[in-house]
Amino acid sequence: MLDMKRNRERMVKQQLETRGITDPAVLAAMRSVPRHLFVQEALRAQAYEDHPLPIGYGQTISQPFIVALMSQIIEPQPGLRVLEIGTGSGYQAAVLAEMGLDVYTVERIRELHAAARDLLRTLKYRKVRLKLDDGTLGWPEAAPYDRILVTAGGPEVPLPLIEQLADPGIMVIPVGASKRMQELVVVRKQGGRVVRESKGGVAFVDLVGTHGWRG
């Protein structure tokens, strides 16, 4: 366990601080959350390396830098309500909860949803609520959300997510006309206006659903 703690510290210093991650809350959360528990046991030795890892069912856990970058982009503050689309193994949700945000997370794959639910409960992340559903529809029953973070790439920003974003609010989402190659888009809603900004190229798994790619 001590080695894993050292690995987390090395990850923060070498992969995050050197690449523009400066938010103290994000850095503290990345130091704290045991990423190795959110990857397959056979891959735990690689948990803190600078690349994504498969988690089964054609899905991945994003590389640490991308998790930190997206967390920083949404300007996290304790008590904000955040909707995550694409629970995966639950790591991004844990990072958000570690920073004190109230997390609502949606996953379409039943097995991943169940595994993430059990692990987050074991680790006592009580501020995380999970739902099994089509993430492109959001979670309308609990809307609006101060922040929305999407961990899969679709052809466009789903309209339901724009509608469920609070005003003011921030969303970060990979968007691209071709699968697996997108731009990281920041959507800001302010005073009834919606403004988009690109943060550069990224490569995410497909956002599958009614307002995404067909499965």
UniProtKB/Swiss-Prot annotation:
User: PROSITE patterns from the entry?
Assistant: PCMT
Query: Gene Ontology cellular component?
Result: cytoplasm
Which keywords does this chain's UniProt record carry? Cytoplasm, Methyltransferase, S-adenosyl-L-methionine, Transferase
Q: Name one GO molecular function term.
A: protein-L-isoaspartate (D-aspartate) O-methyltransferase activity
Source organism of the structure: Nitratidesulfovibrio vulgaris (strain DSM 19637 / Miyazaki F) (Desulfovibrio vulgaris)
UniProt-listed InterPro entries: PCMT, SAM-dependent_MTases_sf
The Swiss-Prot or TrEMBL record describes its family as follows: Belongs to the methyltransferase superfamily. L-isoaspartyl/D-aspartyl protein methyltransferase family.
- Which sites are catalytic? 62
- Name of encoding gene: pcm
Q: What is its EC number?
A: 2.1.1.77
Taxonomically, the superkingdom here is Bacteria
* Designated name of the protein: Protein-L-isoaspartate O-methyltransferase
